[in-house]
Amino acid sequence: MSRDPLNVLIRRVDPDVPLPTYERPGDAGADLRTTESRELAPGERAVLPTGVCIALPEGYAAFVHPRSGLAARCGVALVNAPGTVDAGYRGEIKVIVVNLDPRESVRFERFDRIAQLVVQQVERVRFQEVAELPDSARAAGGFGSTGGHAAVGGASGTSGSAAEGGATGGNRYASVVSDREGQ
């Protein structure tokens, strides 16, 4: 079942920047481009302008996601992924990038695709304070509690001594930003 696309108002801050586009049918994110050329040394971060401002309808938000190719090929990540663009924000969308490669600089040229913009319907909720929350299967299990990786308890979701860092349990928690020297 197909429906008409949501109309989002957009204004170019840079008159030459291409508007965000979906590269292929079915893509969730429209590509955002930088309007600045910039080189990032290993470990350096920068705020890159996209040259566009948007006006989202009430009940919607846009989320700035990383481009997987930049992460896989260059070690580029977004510091606050996903970045949230609220419906009431009218300023230029900017993208906070970081070069996680320990050895190589990465260069962005004007109009390079740097991120993806995903527009989604969002709910405003009313928070109701209670003394106790209802029980669930997960309960208070947090980071790594479901396993699935050797560093957090085994490749098959191991529990018990392996999950506690035993003979096959790895170090239990994987580092979010690891030292990539020697890779």
Where are these regions (language model features)?
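DUTPase catalytic domain/fold
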Residues: 1-183
